[in-house]
Amino acid sequence: VERALLNWETMVGTSDIGIGFPEMYLLDDMNNNLNLYRKKSPITYANNIITPTLIIHSEKDYRCPVEQAEQLFSNLKRRGVDTTMIRFPDESHELSRSGKPNHRIQRFESIIDWHKKQLT
């Protein structure tokens, strides 16, 4: 899971595009249809996740704020799901494309290491 939108409800108040973005995709206002926002939010279904999960997120991601990842991470950890969260300080939503070279390498190596661990 990387730079993910996991909760439409909290995205509204925390994302740099949060005010109009959800309405554009969900075609309804949160005040009119909160149930729709919850139904379309992956975090609503997080209790069904049992698969080991790697979460990668940048601390200065203002598009999909880090709190989105923290919600999933805390849910999985509380329930004992094998979960790792890697946070990149001073990186934005663009980490994989234009982040600092050492962070892009670290990100890539973390993904490879995670898969090696899970496949052995």
Residue ranges and their predicted role:
Residues 1-120:
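Active-site-proximal cap/loop segments of hydrolase catalytic domains
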